[in-house]
Amino acid sequence: MGKITDRVEDLAQPIVESQGLELVDVEYVKEGENRVLRVFIENPEGEVTLDHCENVSKNLDEKLDEVDPIQESYILEVSSPGIERPLKKKEDFDRFSGKLAYIKTFAPVSGNKEITGIIKGRDGDNIKVLKKDDDKELEIPFSQIAKAHLMVDFDNITG
């Protein structure tokens, strides 16, 4: 499935950028009997609006029909990444420094393959994280990150 998502990313990137938005992620999954192509976009200037999603969806749908990288039928969904936004690029760890994140690694880092902690930025190709459970700072090679996303920090919600 990686080839499909890579191809869709290549098609979606210029469409998303032409609207002043950023492409966060592309997923192609099976849900029940349906195949779903999800494209997550972000507005660096603020919120992603319904108009943003509609415009990207319309333009991307036209491009997908033209190029036809997916042979089977599917549902196209375009949305914001939500509160638990995936962290896919090294720059995401700079941008979201100070935020709580979940990180799963390919191999154990200091005995852990699953780490929850505060992002402290990065040092070159290493992501710095302050573990939530013991306040120990870890450096995780970016190449070892299998999956990462922001988390809601319920301990620091004020209201």
Swiss-Prot record:
Gene Ontology CC: one annotated term: cytosol
Organism: Halothermothrix orenii (strain H 168 / OCM 544 / DSM 9562)
Sequence similarity: Belongs to the RimP family.
Keyword annotations from UniProtKB, A to Z: Cytoplasm, Ribosome biogenesis
This protein's name: Ribosome maturation factor RimP
Record function comment: Required for maturation of 30S ribosomal subunits.
Gene that encodes it: rimP
Biological processes, Gene Ontology terms: ribosomal small subunit assembly; translation
Compartment(s) where it occurs, according to its Swiss-Prot or TrEMBL record: Cytoplasm
One Pfam family this sequence matches: RimP_N
Coarse class of the protein's main subcellular location: cytoplasm
Cross-referenced HAMAP family: RimP
